[in-house]
Amino acid sequence: MARRPLVMGNWKLNGSKAFTKALIEDLKTELAGVEGCDVAIAPPVMYLAEAEAALKCSCSCGGKAIALGAQNVDVNVQGAFTGDISTEMLKDFGAKYIIIGHSERRTYHKESDEFIAKKFAALKQAGLVPVLCIGESEAENEAGKTEEVCARQIDAVLNTLGAEAFNGAVIAYEPIWAIGTGKSATPAQAQAVHAFIRGHIAKKDNAVAEQVIIQYGGSVNDANAAELFTQPDIDGALVGGASLKAPAFAVIVKAAAKAKN
């Protein structure tokens, strides 16, 4: 089946109120008239209000529809959980695509596969779209454990929620050794892992596997995106540094739209 690509910008710990408004205005200009690719951005949670307002203005002025996302969520809806953000709070700002399982969260905040699966469940229950990040470290890659690691991270969801939980969800394969390093998996390497991920889900439910969006992340930029998107199982990208520059991000979006339509 034809899958509509999704390119999402993960701004990480970057930006300001002024930066958020300016970048969205620039994206509106750069992406004018681009069809065939869904686009989302995940600014820091402090700037969701500015982003929501700027995106509403963009749509009302006939600009490209850009969805709002977030970089994290907690499993609790409310209560004594200092510093956490709930699904309902994110919905209140119009956020749709929520990143979970990013290697920076797994590493710096010691988030386990099991905890990430609980976040996945919370997002599905709230009607939001999980963007589940998976991927291996450089040591695991060199030891030939890429598929083993990816399978384990996916199984945390599969074995608790079932394959149907991936209906309407997004997976982002981000090899840790390629994130922010300037290194990137070759298109063939990335395709092999994406095909494995889809095949792993297909063992449980082929129909779900065929429709799930699998993005590539890990030093995706305006120079390598087009070649990555020629691969049949790469359905877009989760973009880090390049998403902070409207022209570079727009090149990636346009490359996805061209390759998949």
From Swiss-Prot:
Q: Which Enzyme Commission number(s) are on file for it?
A: 5.3.1.1
Which is one GO molecular function term here? triose-phosphate isomerase activity
Tell me yes or no: is Transport among this UniProt entry's keywords: no
Per the record, the pathway is: Carbohydrate biosynthesis; gluconeogenesis; Carbohydrate degradation; glycolysis; D-glyceraldehyde 3-phosphate from glycerone phosphate: step 1/1
Instruction: Provide the GO biological process annotations.
Output: gluconeogenesis; glyceraldehyde-3-phosphate biosynthetic process; glycerol catabolic process; glycolytic process
What reaction does this enzyme carry out catalytically?
Answer: D-glyceraldehyde 3-phosphate = dihydroxyacetone phosphate
The record's subcellular location field reads:
Cytoplasm
- Catalytic residues per the record? H102, E174
Enumerate the residues binding substrate: N10, W11, K12, G180, S219, G240, G241
Q: Quote the cellular component terms of the Gene Ontology held in the record.
A: cytosol
Q: Per the UniProt record, which residue ranges are transmembrane? A: none
**Which keywords accompany this UniProt record?**
Cytoplasm, Gluconeogenesis, Glycolysis, Isomerase
The broad enzyme category this protein falls into is isomerase
Indicate the principal place this protein occupies in or around the cell. cytoplasm
A Pfam family of this chain: TIM
Query: Which PROSITE patterns does the entry link to?
Result: TIM_1, TIM_2
Q: Which protein family is named in the record?
A: Belongs to the triosephosphate isomerase family.
Q: How does this polypeptide assemble, per the annotation?
A: Homodimer.
Q: What does this protein do?
A: Involved in the gluconeogenesis. Catalyzes stereospecifically the conversion of dihydroxyacetone phosphate (DHAP) to D-glyceraldehyde-3-phosphate (G3P).
Q: What is this protein called?
A: Triosephosphate isomerase
Source organism of the structure:
Pasteurella multocida (strain Pm70)
